[in-house]
């Protein structure tokens, strides 16, 4: 079952599934609410190398580090993670900050390793690139940051290489807008690949009609 978070009007869901049910998951996905704008959040996707307990140790070290420094600029935070994970086997990590603007919203993304991120707008997927490397193994400087605008109705997705990077998305279903966890579950069923853990995060940037619907149902 996906974990569900409401940050301002945005709905965020995360789903992490281990390769083997008896093992801890080596992927971690989290959303951290920040003080400031109506929607101001830091999103994390960490994929510990391999799977099993040692991969989980690396992923959870990433979660703890980000939780301790959520307002740090993304390049600095990535370098802090690189130091914090040196005692682990390392991880691929994606960091994304989403925030409200007068025009709608904006995202900033920094990734190292084979985590994937994209903005989904209507029928168009805008994929964001991660730079080569392993966090914990010496991250190359400077850490690149990419920015994109967000419009009402947009989606943001982050996922590990447990899902096919060539995944395609149909027209969004209304129930996904109400509960992005259903989208996470759909992606895990449809696009799982290889022998690896899965980590996926879905964030819906709502349209005004969606906000009205949620207000009527008490934020359901």
Can you say where each PLM-predicted feature lies in the sequence?
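Residue-level marker for buried hydrophobic side chains located in beta-strands
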Residues: 44, 111, 156-158
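Active-site metal-binding loops of divalent metal-dependent hydrolases
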Residues: 47-49, 115, 161-162
